[in-house]
Amino acid sequence: KIPCGESCVWIPCLTSVFNCKCENKVCYHD
């Protein structure tokens, strides 16, 4: 998993357009 450099504590992952998903309050992609 690669961190997308974004947290998702209060808001969803804005980087989800790059297939990033919230996991442990941090956005990751495979």
Swiss-Prot record:
Modification(s) after translation: This is a cyclic peptide.
Signal peptide: none
Disulfide bonds: C4-C20, C8-C22, C13-C27
Keywords: Antiviral protein, Disulfide bond, Knottin, Plant defense
Covalent cross-link (Cyclopeptide (Lys-Asp)), residues: K1-D30
Record bears the keyword Zinc: no
KW Disulfide bond (keyword) present: yes
Free-text note on domains in this protein's UniProt record: The presence of a 'disulfide through disulfide knot' structurally defines this protein as a knottin.
Family of the protein in this entry: Belongs to the cyclotide family. Bracelet subfamily.
Protein name, UniProt field: Circulin-E
The organism of origin for this protein: Chassalia parviflora
